[in-house]
Amino acid sequence: MKIDLNADLGEGCASDAELLTLVSSANIACGFHAGDAQIMQACVREAIKNGVAIGAHPSFPDRENFGRSAMQLPPETVYAQTLYQIGALATIARAQGGVMRHVKPHGMLYNQAAKEAQLADAIARAVYACDPALILVGLAGSELIRAGKQYGLTTREEVFADRGYQADGSLVPRSQSGALIENEEQALAQTLEMVQHGRVKSITGEWATVAAQTVCLHGDGEHALAFARRLRSAFAEKGIVVAA
């Protein structure tokens, strides 16, 4: 069995360089919620050095709230903003001899695109316009995954090690209790259950079906590095290979 392990990087966290030795894919902030040209360049350089797949992490234009504010923007605006961000990272990667492999929206853009078909379509269309060979990463079973498939893109369904789930397979909003799993043992058990058995127990006790093709590790967590190492060890014990 193989699983991709991804982390959101270039967001000002001190652990980026070390996380790149533990993950197989990096989602690099493109300036709209965090990061800048120099940080993008540095992240790309480190990703290439570690053999980690490079991906763009586009966001709503919301540096003030780290891309976590809900926005109602016209689909054409989102299309243009997404194209702008992934185009910038693709060029930075190419200039350093690398290749951008995937795109994963950030924060509220990701969450809204999971449920809003028009928004999902705008993102998938931008990814396709930039490069039809790019992989589109989205929440397992979401509108974004459906939109990607409609454009003929390769999609990668994502699950979260440290997030609580609702009965329909969606994430518990960060504003609600149970959104974040801070108990390491619980997060580890949830991740193995999703990867090995394709299901997750919701905060209300029901089992939800999920397709786990990539697992997100949040690099901004207090114990991100220690948990990443534990997860790698657990995968190795179960014979699960970490690879993009």
From Swiss-Prot:
Superkingdom: Bacteria
Stated name of the protein: 5-oxoprolinase subunit A
Subunit structure comment from the entry: Forms a complex composed of PxpA, PxpB and PxpC.
Record EC number: 3.5.2.9
Gene that this sequence comes from: pxpA
CDD domains registered for this protein in UniProt: LamB_YcsF_YbgL_like
Record keywords, A-Z: ATP-binding, Hydrolase, Nucleotide-binding
Molecular function GO labels: 5-oxoprolinase (ATP-hydrolyzing) activity; ATP binding
Top EC class for this record: hydrolase
Knockout-associated phenotype: Deletion of the gene slows growth on minimal medium with ammonium as nitrogen source.
Gene3D superfamilies hit by this protein: Glycoside hydrolase/deacetylase
Keyword Nucleotide-binding: yes
One annotated GO biological process: carbohydrate metabolic process
Keyword flag rRNA-binding: no
NCBIfam families in the cross-refs: PRK05406.1-1, PRK05406.1-3, PRK05406.1-4, PRK05406.1-5
HAMAP family: PxpA
Catalytic activity: 5-oxo-L-proline + ATP + 2 H2O = L-glutamate + ADP + phosphate + H(+)
Organism whose genome encodes this protein: Escherichia coli (strain K12)
InterPro entries documented for this protein: Glyco_hydro/deAcase_b/a-brl (IPR011330), LamB/YcsF/PxpA-like (IPR005501)
